[in-house]
């Protein structure tokens, strides 16, 4: 196809491999070349591919038949145990195999409990600049015909899962690559927090639903797929194991008294703006952003919080969202986040929040027999 973009012999069409070796060499992507494309064979139904054209021109696909039955695809994870790693080894690139739109809700519901990674039981779609997250908390999404998308695969290194696209997942509604409509049913509210620095805009989404809880709600909570110099995310209110969440669902009935850890990655010396980009919470619910380092409490319904950091920011423990019926002011509350967890297969324990602690932290570690094996103080 002459409309496929080229860069020398490299063609702007290729596939994704999630091994650590492939990811370290080119973020997992392999492009066909003018010498390899001729022997590449046919597209695999259900497998995703990357593609770019000259000037955004249309690409024509030809085949003898279209899929009218169920389609299966084998997805494999090469993750070695880190639940919060963002190296791409837990993801597979799949695609809608039908000539109709595919329901994200139906797809996730069919795979979230067995085949999809518990922290990543969502659909991740590339928008040309970053990955957008679609979960059960963002209802009514449709994936365009042949559109590719990333999914997290459940299991230890080398585990394969069968992904099944069924005709029942097809829908006749949708437009564009990923269509989204939001019926905003009763007992539902949304709060999106935005980070802006150097003209980069990032967003994390909080949903308040009847089925939401403070812990992990598989399919409704979705971890971030990729992090960079500019990122914003939340942490689970309960049972936090160091996983950075892009979508977090919480109980609608409990939103009047909630403190949510907020993570920020940003660079030193450049202005940062944190604010609300979308809100459907009740008008009389106050929403404050706490900066533990500065000791400030900002009403972000009234305006954004803007500052210039003196050093790079990376992680959680400094910022918290407070949702309350009360009026709060600077110095009234000082939230402290000290979190400890161990990754699967890791031979170490991660401690978070030390930078925001004003006093020394005493750490004691016991083995399964109850014997103290470590007793130390951290400054």
Label for each model-derived stretch:
Residues 1-10, 16-379:
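Compositionally biased Ser/Thr/Gly- and acidic/asparagine-rich
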């Amino acid at each position: 196809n002459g409309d496929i973009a080229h860069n020398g012999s490299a063609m702007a069409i290729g596939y994704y491999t999630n091994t650590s070796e492939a990811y370290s060499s080119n973020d997992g992507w392999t492009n066909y070349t003018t010498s390899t494309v001729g022997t590449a064979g046919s597209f695999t139904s259900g497998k995703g591919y990357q593609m770019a054209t000259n000037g955004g021109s249309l690409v024509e696909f030809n085949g003898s038949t279209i899929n009218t039955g169920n389609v299966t695809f084998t997805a494999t994870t090469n993750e070695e145990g880190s639940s919060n790693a963002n190296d791409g080894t837990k993801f597979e690139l799949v695609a809608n195999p039908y000539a109709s739109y595919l329901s994200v809700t139906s797809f996730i519901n069919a795979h979230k409990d067995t085949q999809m990674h518990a922290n990543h039981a969502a659909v991740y779609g590339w928008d040309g600049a970053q990955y957008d997250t679609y979960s059960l908390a963002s209802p009514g999404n449709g994936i365009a015909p042949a559109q590719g998308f990333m999914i997290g695969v459940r299991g230890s290194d080398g585990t394969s899962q069968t992904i099944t696209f069924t005709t029942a997942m097809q829908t006749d509604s949708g437009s564009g690559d990923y269509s989204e409509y939001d019926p905003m049913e009763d007992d539902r509210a949304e709060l999106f927090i935005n980070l802006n620095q150097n003209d980069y805009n990032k967003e994390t989404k909080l949903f308040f639903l009847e089925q939401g809880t403070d812990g992990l709600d598989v399919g409704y909570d979705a971890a971030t797929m990729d992090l960079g110099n500019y990122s914003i995310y939340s942490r689970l209110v309960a049972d936090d194991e160091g996983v950075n969440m892009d979508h977090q669902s919480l109980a609608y009935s409990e939103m009047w008294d909630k403190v949510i850890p907020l993570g920020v990655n940003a660079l030193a010396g450049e202005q940062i703006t944190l604010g609300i980009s979308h809100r459907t919470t009740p008008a009389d619910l106050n929403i404050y952003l706490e900066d533990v380092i500065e000791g400030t409490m900002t009403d972000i319904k009234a305006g954004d919080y803007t500052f210039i950091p003196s050093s790079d920011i990376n992680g959680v423990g400094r910022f918290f969202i407070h949702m309350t019926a009360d009026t709060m002011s600077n110095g009234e509350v000082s939230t402290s986040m000290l979190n400890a967890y161990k990754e699967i297969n890791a031979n170490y324990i991660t401690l978070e929040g030390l930078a925001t602690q004003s006093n020394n932290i005493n750490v004691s570690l016991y083995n399964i027999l109850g014997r103290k094996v470590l007793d130390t103080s951290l400054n």
